[in-house]
Amino acid sequence: MSSMLNMIDDCSRVLTGTRLYPRECLLAYLDFIPRAFELYGIPLAMYVDYHSFFFTHIPGNLTYLAETLRYFDVSLLYAPTPQAKGKIERHHGFWQNRLPSFCLAEGIRELDPANEQLDLLREHHNRHETHREIRMPPQEAWEQALKEGRSTLRPCQRDPWWPYLWSIRSQVRIDADGTVPLEKQRVKITPTYRRSAIHCRHADGSITYLAEPPGSGGPPIILYRYENATSPPWNV
């Protein structure tokens, strides 16, 4: 079993992202969204549903993902009903009709090779398949909008904080011996006067300990970096 995440530009119908994950979780979104931003730019707003990843019933509060997007000045607009997200739902059906038979024919059984092919299929769809509503390939509509100055996308400029903003962060205590918890062990980090560190879990399975959280001023100070994880924990 796997979950597919899709992102589409509402104006041009360009598929800006399509990717399979072992399951739908926060870490999957933190991997998926920046991929699309890097390829196509950062939008002013995203049209989403009332999933708990995007919406909280506590007035004045933001979800972790919404807080991350706010850092980039991306607002969230909420679809009132599932039918209101018809464009993206049709693309879910589009892939459900094509992908299983394609993977079966190509002998693809793992997510990594499936995602490699998805990138190629998505690009082919954007550039060569005429959309029945706009009567042109999505990529052509995209380029036309850019030429006519109808795009509000902002260039994606990766600053040093980029990989840490798109991680799951938590504060951990630094013990008197200068160690922090790492999986089922403890590791010694770069000596610091601080009594706590920021634990960052990345989508590639790696873990970073920072001295300060994003937005604290100055560049990130890395206290420890762990890159030996075999696979990302797709359950957070």
Please provide the spans of the model-predicted regions.
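Generic secretory/membrane-interface signal
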Residues: 3, 43, 79, 119, ...
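A general structural signal for well-ordered alpha-helical packing
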Residues: 92, 96, 115-122, 139-143, ...
